[in-house]
Swiss-Prot record:
The keyword RNA-binding applies. Part of the 50S ribosomal subunit. Forms a cluster with proteins L14 and L19. InterPro entries: Ribosomal_uL3, Ribosomal_uL3_bac/org-type, Ribosomal_uL3_CS, Transl_B-barrel_sf. It holds the Pfam family Ribosomal_L3. SUPFAM superfamilies: Translation proteins. This is Large ribosomal subunit protein uL3. One of its GO terms (molecular function) is structural constituent of ribosome. It comes from Acetivibrio thermocellus (strain ATCC 27405 / DSM 1237 / JCM 9322 / NBRC 103400 / NCIMB 10682 / NRRL B-4536 / VPI 7372). One of the primary rRNA binding proteins, it binds directly near the 3'-end of the 23S rRNA, where it nucleates assembly of the 50S subunit.
Length: 212
């Protein structure tokens, strides 16, 4: 069975394992999520389910979203995301899925979120380029470096790493261990850091590349 969940990043803390070793963890408010649509090959060309998460005032929704929730007869939700599944018929419309139904301690997950915005950044911060010499007479400290050849090709190649906006990108961190699942409070503790700021939306899925 596929494992997936939507959540909200709360922050980081630390816990101790049975051997007394300290483990840095991210606390995630995970679910519950509600199934709002099923997609099948006959109608959409592929199998998936769309799920909703997070309470929101109805006035914050657009007309298609209002219509979707009104048709289902459920409270409006802030986020709607789609997950690929093998068989959508295993899920029912308006079905509520809780975190303990999907994940247990010891599972490994991939967590996707939107990274923190860093504003306009140079190539050293943005891409980790080496800096230039700080010696007397050097005018090259934090600059870009070579921009290409001269007369030919007479242009800067596409993909050249240059200063620009950093962050606010979709980032996935793979193979994180699930340390604890708190069913009563809908909390999930994941070892290590996950993308995004506090309160940011996270997509949590069963890992696709298991560690050897």
């Amino acid at each position: 069975m596929e494992k997936f969940m939507l959540g909200r990043k709360i922050g980081m803390t630390q816990v101790f394992d049975e051997d007394g070793l300290l483990i840095p963890v991210t606390v995630i408010e995970a679910g519950p999520i509600t199934v709002v649509q099923k997609k099948k090959p006959e109608t959409d060309g592929y199998n998936s389910v769309r799920v909703a998460f997070g309470d929101v005032q109805e006035k914050r929704l657009n007309k298609p979203e209002k219509g979707l929730f009104a048709k289902l007869g459920i409270a409006p939700k802030k986020y709607i995301r789609e997950f690929r599944v093998d068989d959508p018929d295993k899920y029912e419309l308006k079905q509520e899925i809780k975190v303990e139904e999907m994940f247990q301690p010891g599972d490994r997950v991939d967590v996707t979120g939107i990274s923190k915005g860093k504003g306009f950044a140079g190539v050293i911060k943005r891409f980790g380029n080496r800096r230039g010499k700080e010696t007397h007479g050097s005018m090259y400290h934090r600059r870009v470096g070579s921009m290409g050849a001269n007369t030919n090709p007479a242009r800067v190649f596409k993909g050249k790493k240059l200063p620009g906006h950093m962050g606010v990108e979709r980032v996935t961190v793979q193979n994180l261990d699930v340390v604890k699942v708190d069913a009563e409070r809908n909390l999930m503790l994941v070892k290590g850091a996950v993308p995004g700021a506090k309160g940011g939306l996270l997509m949590i899925k069963d890992t696709v590349k298991a560690r050897k």
